[in-house]
Amino acid sequence: MKLQDNLKSIKKELERIKVENWSKENIDKNTYRYIRLFDIDDSLMNQKICFFGWVKSSRSSSKISFIELISQFKIIKCVIPTKVKLTDHTTLKVWGIMKPNNGNDEHQFEIDVQAYEVYGGYQAPSFPLNIHSDKDTLLDLAHLGLRMPHRILFLQAQNELLKALRKFYWNNNYTEITPPTLVQTQVEGGATLFKLNYYDQPAYLTQSSQLYLETVAPVVGKAFCIMPSYRAEKSKTSRHLSEFTHVEAELVDIQFDELMDQIEQLIRSTINEFYKNILPEIKKIDNDFQPVVLSDKQFKKITYEDAIHFLIAQNHKKTDNTDYQLGDDISDASEKFLLETYGENQPIFLIRFPTDHKPFYVAKDQYGTQTCDLLFPGIGEIVGGSMRETNYNNLLDGFKRENIDHEPYSWYLDMAKFGPSPHGGYGLGFERLLMCLMKYKSVDQSTLYCRKPSRCTP
């Protein structure tokens, strides 16, 4: 009975949203040139064209209707010489003639509609989202949220940031690779691994592509990848995801200071290129938006030890309200405090962490570990990097220290035998950087479909 009631309800809804196509009399649709909406411009003035789009807005009076159609971020104004009722997001195929725009709006031209068809015969139901929808509803209906202006802007911003990153790498002779995401090794600690059965063998979703980049870098000199990584952390902060886009690079024949210079160049170049392309689109939605502006001064550096002493001197407490001591992890809130005070709201490198704070592969010199985290205003860490250990025995000691069986890493250990060289690399959290640049409140907003402990859908 319940199934029958549901079917009746669906049938009733379909009848409600069913809509008739419309056409002027005696038009020959074969005389209209088909063109994609994105390619329509004023060079087609007075020409007959046919195109396809989605209703962005619709208003009508007793004798005329104004419809905005959207596709590929472009909006076209259509004028229909009769009253029609079309819901937002309904799909239309339109036959019309381009005319000069007679309205007081931003459109350069308008389409005098001669006919339209509703694709599938049904217009879209009432849209279930609006600017007042709560966070969970927006995440539950993220597939529909992509039709909203702020999420359309997100898609544009995501695309522009990926382009800006790749432009830096390609302009600086990096080689892009596509390493595997099913692995039998760990990089960041076994507690954060997603384990799965791989043809009756244990395997994991990758935490990082670093080890594979290290095998490629000796061949190409500089390698990078932009791939998903996975962390089984039950963290509920605004900057953590269980699946995220990991921008990683590895460079050979490089020293520690050069590595940090490369990271800084990447950040500066990417931000400049990103805003150059996306800022006009942001301003259309938020005219008061202020982009991130970096100082011309080189990013400051502070050692882990000096940072702890600085926090103590500033009477800045840990999350449990006790004093910091050497050996403590520096919390997210304390990273932000360092940025605001020591960093003067500019990015800073936090460097030379204790050995037991970093994985088996990090290299050391007389000053300590050659490690760096780039902290960024508003969020904290966005990049983690280090020089890599190249001595075979030191690597074995690192595995032993972390209680890791080195046998699955035999291929990685070969790198220490077959022509090792000074090399280093880093990983950048793409969603974190996008969150900073777009002034989002959470990485949930800077990912297409959020994946975290409480969410694996849609």
From Swiss-Prot:
Keyword Magnesium: no
Organism: Enterocytozoon bieneusi (strain H348)
Cross-referenced PANTHER family: ASPARAGINE--TRNA LIGASE, CYTOPLASMIC, ASPARTYL/LYSYL-TRNA SYNTHETASE
UniProt KW keywords: Aminoacyl-tRNA synthetase, ATP-binding, Cytoplasm, Ligase, Nucleotide-binding, Protein biosynthesis
Protein location: Cytoplasm
Protein name per Swiss-Prot or TrEMBL: Probable asparagine--tRNA ligase, cytoplasmic
Gene Ontology cellular-component annotations: cytoplasm
Reactions performed catalytically: tRNA(Asn) + L-asparagine + ATP = L-asparaginyl-tRNA(Asn) + AMP + diphosphate + H(+)
GO biological process: asparaginyl-tRNA aminoacylation
Family: Belongs to the class-II aminoacyl-tRNA synthetase family.
Coiled-coil ranges (or none): none
UniProt-listed Enzyme Commission number(s): 6.1.1.22
Major site of localization recorded for this protein: cytoplasm
Cited PROSITE patterns: AA_TRNA_LIGASE_II (PS50862)
Single GO MF descriptor: ATP binding
